[in-house]
């Protein structure tokens, strides 16, 4: 272990400096000279000044660069208009959705409120209208006969009627039977009208054939010449048959 080294201390005699009466003057408050600064002043203001200078420099540099990257007034107005239109379109979509929902609900309520007792009146009017249509179609088909397909009446009215005829099953069945009967009649008439020209053609062909057969019969019924040799009554031999061509030749000779 190293031993502690004792330092030599000097002893000061204050009596050498003079009287102690003037000792208080040394501790008196004396104003510092103007040229020197006090050590107690804080150092923070320097930092603040530096920060201010930096901000000013940045601001000036941004002002210099701003004309290049600055947006024009027209562009800014366009952006505002776009934002406004987007907001309005979103609001309109929401309003349209609400209107559609309300209209659907109102339509369901109206359908429920329709009375079924008035179905008969509506069906009677539809009957009259369909009957008139059928009559006009019959007249047109009789006047203008063509080789086209038979006329078919659309079943839209019958389908619409069936939706409103749930309460009156008997009336609906009778009406359907009548409509089907009218359709069958129209189809039969068109088929008959198509068959009539074919029958006329057949009759003309038969007449031509009959005329030809009559001519053939008339030619075959011409008189045949007499035979050259006649058999005697004594003998029982049969006479020989001679064709008509030879007989004619012999007679000419």
Curated annotation (Swiss-Prot):
Comp. bias (Polar residues): 199-222
Start and end residues of each stretch annotated as Interaction with DNA: 32-51, 190-241
TM regions (residue ranges): none
Region listing for Disordered, in residue ranges: 33-74, 141-169, 184-244
Classification via InterPro entries: HR_DNA-Binding_Protein
Compositional bias segments (type: Basic residues): 184-195
GO MF annotations, alphabetized: D-loop DNA binding; DNA binding; DNA secondary structure binding; double-stranded DNA binding; single-stranded DNA binding
Oligomer status and interactors: Monomer.
Cellular compartments per GO CC: chromosome; nucleus
Native source organism of the sequence: Gallus gallus (Chicken)
Composition bias type Acidic residues, residue spans: 154-169
Keyword Membrane carried by entry: no
This protein's UniProt keywords: Chromosome, DNA damage, DNA recombination, DNA repair, DNA-binding, Meiosis, Nucleus
Protein name: RAD51-associated protein 1
Function noted in UniProt: Structure-specific DNA-binding protein involved in DNA repair by promoting RAD51-mediated homologous recombination. Acts by stimulating D-Loop formation by RAD51: specifically enhances joint molecule formation through its structure-specific DNA interaction and its interaction with RAD51. Binds single-stranded DNA (ssDNA), double-stranded DNA (dsDNA) and secondary DNA structures, such as D-loop structures: has a strong preference for branched-DNA structures that are obligatory intermediates during joint molecule formation.
Location in or out of the cell: Chromosome; Nucleus
């Amino acid at each position: 272990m190293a031993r502690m080294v004792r330092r030599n201390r000097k002893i000061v005699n204050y009596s050498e400096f003079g009287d102690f009466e003037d000792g208080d003057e040394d501790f008196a408050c004396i104003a510092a000279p103007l040229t020197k600064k006090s050590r107690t002043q804080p150092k923070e203001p320097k930092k603040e000044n530096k920060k201010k200078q930096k901000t000013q420099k940045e601001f000036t540099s941004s002002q210099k660069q701003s004309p290049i990257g600055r947006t024009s007034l027209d562009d800014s107005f366009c952006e505002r208009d776009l934002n406004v239109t987007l907001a309005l379109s979103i609001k309109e979509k929401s309003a349209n959705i609400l209107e559609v929902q309300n209209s659907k609900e109102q339509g369901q309520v109206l359908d429920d409120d329709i009375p079924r007792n008035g179905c008969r009146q509506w069906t009677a009017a539809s009957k009259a209208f369909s009957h008139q249509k059928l009559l006009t179609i019959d007249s047109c088909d009789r006047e203008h006969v063509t080789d086209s397909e038979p006329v078919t009446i659309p079943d839209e009215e019958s389908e619409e009627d069936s939706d409103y005829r749930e309460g009156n099953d008997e009336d609906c069945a009778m009406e359907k039977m009548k409509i089907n009967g009218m359709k069958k009649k129209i189809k039969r008439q068109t088929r008959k009208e198509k068959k009539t020209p074919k029958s006329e053609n057949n009759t003309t062909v038969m007449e031509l054939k009959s005329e030809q057969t009559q001519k053939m019969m008339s030619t075959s019924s011409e008189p045949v010449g007499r035979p050259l040799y006649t058999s005697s009554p004594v003998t029982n031999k049969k006479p020989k048959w001679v064709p008509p061509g030879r007989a004619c030749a012999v007679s000419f000779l």
